[in-house]
UniProtKB/Swiss-Prot annotation:
HAMAP family: KdpC (MF_00276)
Subunit note: The system is composed of three essential subunits: KdpA, KdpB and KdpC.
UniProt protein name: Potassium-transporting ATPase KdpC subunit
Residues making up the signal peptide according to the UniProt record: none
InterPro entries: KdpC
Source species: Klebsiella pneumoniae subsp. pneumoniae (strain ATCC 700721 / MGH 78578)
TM helices/strands, residue ranges: 6-26
Entry GO CC: plasma membrane
Domain of life: Bacteria
Primary localisation category: membrane
Matches recorded under NCBIfam families: kdpC, PRK00315.1
Molecular function per GO: ATP binding; P-type potassium transmembrane transporter activity
Topological category with respect to the lipid bilayer: Single-pass membrane protein
Family in the record: Belongs to the KdpC family.
Classification of source organism: Bacteria, Pseudomonadati, Pseudomonadota, Gammaproteobacteria, Enterobacterales
Name of the gene this protein is made from: kdpC
Length: 191
């Protein structure tokens, strides 16, 4: 009987601490210090949510930059269905899918270098990658410029402006957020 009371008190105390105080504290700090990130890194235009800086979208029109292909192609609007294809590099299905993507990209981008950047034909581990390297974005510039009736220099300048350098300039590689780049293209059209 003498052990039950301290065990019960400790159980109640730890339940309140780990089930109440700790979650409230971490949620409050997250909302205070990292409000945008804690709420999904949403990108808004005129008060309307256009997407998240963290979730890739499927852009198919010629006047938009395209992101990485998704292994969740059937459910591109559902980020809960994220995941890679889990196909091995030696799998014929992966080889066929990559070959088809290369052919489609070459057909859609006839003025681009025939060497297609690898991230435009392979899926990411999450299937929802939102960024490309500047090289992959620049590869698409001739198609986007032609479709939008802009100069290659204008579109290249937008890509360069949208390029984000990694933290401390050495932790990672520069990337271009495709949603933000496409929104910048739309803003250029509206001017």
């Amino acid at each position: 009987m003498s052990l039950i009371r301290p065990a019960l008190v400790l159980f109640i105390l730890l339940t309140l601490l780990t089930g109440g105080v700790y979650p409230l504290l971490t949620t409050s700090l997250g909302q205070w210090w990292f409000n945008s990130q804690a709420n999904g890194s949403l990108i808004r235009l005129n008060g309307e949510v256009r997407g998240s800086a963290l979730i890739g979208q499927n852009f198919t029109a010629a006047g938009y930059f395209q992101g990485r292909p998704s292994a969740t192609a059937e459910t591109t609007d559902n980020p809960m269905a994220s995941g890679g294809s889990n196909l091995a590099a030696s799998n014929p299905a992966l080889d066929k899918a990559v070959s088809e993507r290369v052919q489609a990209l070459r057909a859609a981008n006839p003025d681009a270098d025939p060497r297609v950047p690898v991230e435009l034909v392979t899926t990411s581990a999450s299937g929802l990658d939102n960024n490309l390297t500047p090289a992959a974005a620049l590869w698409q510039v001739p198609r986007v410029a032609q479709a939008r009736q802009l100069s290659v220099e204008q579109v290249t300048q937008l890509v360069n402006q949208a390029t984000q350098t990694p933290l401390l300039s050495f932790l990672g590689q520069p990337v271009v957020n495709i949603l933000q780049l496409n929104m910048a293209l739309d803003a250029l059209k509206d001017k």
